[in-house]
Amino acid sequence: MLTHKTCQARKKMQVSFVIRDAEEKQHRNGVNSLQLDPNNGKLYSAGRDAIIRVWNTRSESSEKYIQSMEHHNDWVNDIVLCCNGRNLISASCDTTVKVWNAQKGFCMSTLRTHRDYVQALAYAKDREQVASAGLDKAIFLWDVNTLTALTASNNTVTTSSLTGSKDSIYSLAMNPSGTVIVSGSTENILRIWDPRTCMRSMKLRGHTENVRCLVVSPDGNQVVSGSSDGTIKVWNLGQQRCVQTIHVHKEGVWSLLMSENFQYIISGSRDQNIIVTEMRNPSNKTLVCEEKAPVLSLGYNMDKTGVWATTWNSDIRCWKLPMYDRGTLNSSGGLDAQWTQGGTELACIKGGAAIKECTVLNDKRYILTKDSQDQVVLYDVLRVVKKDTLGPIDYEAEVKKRNKQVYIPNWFTVDLKTGMPTIVLGQEEVDCFSAWVSIEAGLPECVDPTTEIKINYGKLLLEALLEYWTPPHSIPQNELEPDMHGNGYFQVPKHTPVIFSEVGGRTVCRLLVRDAAGDSECTLLHETAPQWVTDVVIEKNIPKFLKIPFFLQPHPQMTKPERTKKDRLVANEFIQCRKVCEHVLEKVLNAETTPSGANANNSLQNSQSDGNSEGSQLPAEERIELSCNDVVVDPNMDLRTVRHFIWKQSTDLTFQYKTKQNFNYDGSIGDSLERVTRKY
């Protein structure tokens, strides 16, 4: 993979991945742009799910899918076919412009010149020149032949820039000969450049809101623009003014398509209508169809008798275009002109459902989602899989049903922008290493009854995602033993995309789990992976434990309290309350204790009888009762859960203890729980 890099300081990084199927044949969100190859009938669609898909429009069956082109990790905003259909250029919210082999579907190179979302592309067919523009107010010109010739040894590319824009650019257009380039922005004006000299020639005022779409006539003399103000304007560049304003939509105009003779305008709007209008006589118009959502993009079908349309929804539909029949001479000497009937749906490429709602369950391992078709699905974040499809059930009731009374710190966030669940791991507001749990709770299928192990969700997941990454020059600690990869418990799907990106910024690296073993991918990971990732994946360091301070004092009902003052202790936050009970018996009451799950007879066979031997064989939690805020605490609860659900205060947690039976005890308060917890 070739990368056009700019020099910049190392920034804070995050790691994200997408829970998805190995092959996603349907768009899972809106479709922003279309390109039809008239040579073979292939339709290219740029999705908000970050995927470009290719369809066979000549197929009579409902199965038109050919392949997916994947390397972006955010909305693909625009695409253009070039080099007679051999290559495709794409622009994305991930701030990159990518060059693709359109026939084989792989990414040839990535251009990282833009500093913000890349919103629009323009193509001059006769010159094989592409322009890109976006929210960074910049316009760059690219020579397509140079881009497609990039290799591993020849990876330097130069670009010309068009300066002067003062606001974010949302639309861009060029004529085929590349003599005129026009941009539209939130500045509400059109700026015109000569791309041959990179000089700005004029700016045109008239729109009152963002200019969302543009078309330049083949001769470069006229421009048609659509705006969020609901109008379509026709501009004469020679006269440097608007010569016509067309009002046919009730809301913003987001897409324009012109007839070959530049006489008819087909427009798609936020009002969900597609309308065809005669440019010279705007009153001569007709409705093509009413879509089910705001219209994002339009494109002709093969014989230009219909128009493909995309919307906020994931379906792509082809509608029959009405034709204007100027009619015959009537008795009064006029013409009986009329539109032929259009609006028939000629074809439909069905899309999939986009996830619209998501809840992270209290166990911080599973998420529950609801999509645009009201289907409720359970995902396992740790194993990166869809766990269960529950159907169109009551979402809120299911969340309530599945939420347990357990508190585990947030260790990931969920992004639904693409319509699929993207899980984000980082070290900023949410620490991905904050979730320590017992293996019994986190991975019950891996429990060894003879051990009590704590696992860290973030560490296990990063080790699984980067299981195949072996850094250059790595040497096993023991050459007689093989290198240990992964986390030793489970693997994640090998098709999972893993993305390294700057926090709140640009993508640095994207790869699939299975590809991390490649030489180039290993080198790229070595250069881009943040230190907090290499610490756990390569160095095998253990994330630090988070500790909780708390007070321990006798309950007022204690018959013979050892002392009345509170003692301040510190312990790992995942320590269960049964350990506090053991501490009370061992260190406060100096009584013998049987660890939970141990054989009482074996552990106490050498202990002296004190008259309470039968009681002393019971686990500590059956001999000591802990309470917090006058609520008896479940010994299986950990300290952080008690603090979150019962204590509910910002001050240090306070426990009261009392015996469930009368025991003989003497001695003083022992060491703090700091020492006790080290062995658990």
UniProtKB/Swiss-Prot annotation:
It holds the Pfam family WD40. The keyword Repeat applies. The keyword 4Fe-4S does not apply. Residues 596-609 have a biased composition (Low complexity). GO terms for molecular function: ubiquitin binding. PROSITE patterns: WD_REPEATS_1, WD_REPEATS_2, WD_REPEATS_REGION. The gene is Uaf1. Belongs to the WD repeat WDR48 family. This is WD repeat-containing protein 48 homolog.
